């Protein structure tokens, strides 16, 4: 079995690819069970966010994973291959540690990814697809993330995606305070965005969600209104700023709906930030003159502002991760030796019992105890020496040189 990470992220794949391989909540458990029941992996966890989709697995067939990944999303593996990365063993552990610590994020040092990773692990645990190896990996991962954040200032002055959305809105409108804001969805990202926009005291805030009951507690926190998604065609024209982040597999805001809204607004602009993957807004909306549409990838420049202040902390964080990876690999290699060590001990126990049984029988016959003990010790010595001497006798010249070195090292020999 082998620890392996396979996936795509904002470094390797554009949004148009990432949205095709995202695992929605309705598909996640199915995917985890498919992976493990098909024997492609004995353990599996899936991390799927707006910036990455990654499989963390314990597998005997790493080559089959990319094919499964493509097949699950009804894609051609040859078209997906240029965007995929496959990281084995220590590289997989290093990657997990870096992701959780925020070193691989679009926003260097951001903390939201750690919560998303914990949710992915909880989902895998609930699905029954975590075993000893992945449990240990993620236990170490969360410990390393905590150490990096407490020992460095990697997250200091970090600009979140939510804060970046506010900054972009301020570039479009003279004042957010005079605008009406619509938030589509009721998840963690929408909550963060509402927190940042509420600090600017917009004229009106409204939450639109598939189920208004789920949105109501969030809306009440910010003194916002609530509408169902079905009301969007009639309501969207009333809003200047729209932030959307749902788990919908299909777009919620179409070009036709927004064209009607712009006409109703007499071509007053609408600012939209689409933080969903797959996208909540049809891609064609970006071509409209009076709509300023920004995707997750478009926020990159804003969130990188101020990064210079945090880059100096990266080396210290990487040093912590390097040490932690070495420790984890040491544990993993030790675990891999357990069957061999157990086999050695079992063989030794069989030899011991065999010689002891012979000795008991000899003593029962009245044989001299000294002779019995001498015979038992010779028998044990011969049993334990048989394997190495037989190996040396039957090895090729190349194998023999390596065996001599190993046996000398194991038994502390110093051959002349």
Swiss-Prot record:
Site feature: Important for activity: 95
Subunit structure: Homodimer.
Gene transcribed to yield this protein: hemA
Superkingdom of the organism of origin: Bacteria
Listed pathway(s): Porphyrin-containing compound metabolism; protoporphyrin-IX biosynthesis; 5-aminolevulinate from L-glutamyl-tRNA(Glu): step 1/2
GO biological process, alphabetically ordered: protoporphyrinogen IX biosynthetic process from glutamate
GO molecular function: glutamyl-tRNA reductase activity; NADP binding
Name by which UniProt lists this protein: Glutamyl-tRNA reductase
EC number: 1.2.1.70
Enzyme class, UniProt record, top EC level: oxidoreductase
Positions of substrate binding: 49-52, 105, 110-112, 116
HAMAP family: Glu_tRNA_reductase
PANTHER family named among the record's database cross-references: GLUTAMYL-TRNA REDUCTASE (PTHR43013:SF1)
Function of the molecule: Catalyzes the NADPH-dependent reduction of glutamyl-tRNA(Glu) to glutamate 1-semialdehyde (GSA).
Catalytic activity: (S)-4-amino-5-oxopentanoate + tRNA(Glu) + NADP(+) = L-glutamyl-tRNA(Glu) + NADPH + H(+)
Record: active site: 50
Keyword flag NADP: yes
UniProt keyword NADP present: yes
Pfam families (alphabetical): GlutR_dimer (PF00745), GlutR_N (PF05201), Shikimate_DH (PF01488)
Organism: Thiobacillus denitrificans (strain ATCC 25259 / T1)
UniProt keyword annotations, A-Z: NADP, Oxidoreductase, Porphyrin biosynthesis
More about this protein: During catalysis, the active site Cys acts as a nucleophile attacking the alpha-carbonyl group of tRNA-bound glutamate with the formation of a thioester intermediate between enzyme and glutamate, and the concomitant release of tRNA(Glu). The thioester intermediate is finally reduced by direct hydride transfer from NADPH, to form the product GSA.
């Amino acid at each position: 079995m082998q620890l392996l990470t396979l996936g795509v992220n904002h470094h390797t794949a554009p949004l148009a690819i990432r949205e095709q391989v995202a695992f929605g909540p309705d598909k996640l458990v199915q995917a985890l069970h498919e992976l493990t029941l098909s024997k492609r992996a004995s353990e599996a966890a899936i991390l799927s966010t707006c910036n990455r989709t990654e499989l963390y697995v314990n597998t005997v067939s790493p080559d089959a994973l990319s094919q499964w990944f493509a097949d699950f999303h009804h894609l051609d593996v040859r078209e997906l291959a240029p965007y995929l990365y496959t990281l084995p063993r220590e590289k997989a552990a290093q990657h997990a540690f870096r992701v959780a610590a925020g070193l691989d994020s679009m926003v260097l040092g951001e903390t939201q990814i750690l919560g998303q990773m914990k949710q992915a692990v909880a989902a895998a645990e609930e699905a029954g697809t975590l075993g000893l190896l992945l449990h240990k990996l993620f236990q170490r991962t969360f410990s390393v993330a905590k150490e990096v954040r407490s020992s460095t200032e990697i997250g200091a002055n970090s600009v979140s995606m939510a804060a970046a959305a506010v900054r972009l809105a301020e570039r479009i409108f003279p004042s957010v305070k005079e605008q009406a804001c619509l938030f589509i969805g009721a998840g963690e990202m929408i909550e963060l965005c509402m927190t940042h926009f509420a600090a600017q005291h917009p004229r009106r805030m409204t939450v639109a969600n598939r189920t208004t009951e789920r949105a109501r507690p969030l809306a009440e926190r910010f003194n916002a209104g609530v509408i169902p998604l079905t009301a969007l065609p009639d309501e969207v024209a009333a809003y200047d700023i729209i932030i959307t982040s749902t788990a919908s597999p299909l777009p919620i805001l179409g070009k036709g709906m927004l064209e009607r809204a712009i006409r109703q607004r007499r071509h007053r602009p609408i600012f939209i930030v689409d933080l969903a993957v797959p996208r909540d807004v049809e891609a064609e909306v970006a071509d409209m003159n009076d709509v300023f549409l920004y995707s997750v990838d478009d926020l990159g420049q804003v969130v990188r502002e101020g990064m210079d202040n945090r880059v100096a902390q990266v080396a210290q964080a990487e040093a912590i991760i390097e040490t932690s990876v070495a420790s984890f690999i040491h544990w993993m290699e030790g675990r891999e030796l357990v069957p061999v060590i157990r086999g050695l001990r079992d063989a030794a126990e069989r030899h011991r019992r065999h010689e002891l049984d012979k000795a008991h029988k000899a003593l029962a016959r009245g044989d001299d105890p000294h002779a019995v003990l001498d015979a038992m010790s010779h028998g044990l010595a011969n049993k334990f020496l048989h394997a190495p001497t037989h190996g040396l006798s039957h090895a090729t010249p190349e194998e023999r040189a390596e065996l001599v070195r190993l046996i000398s090292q194991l038994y502390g020999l110093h051959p002349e």
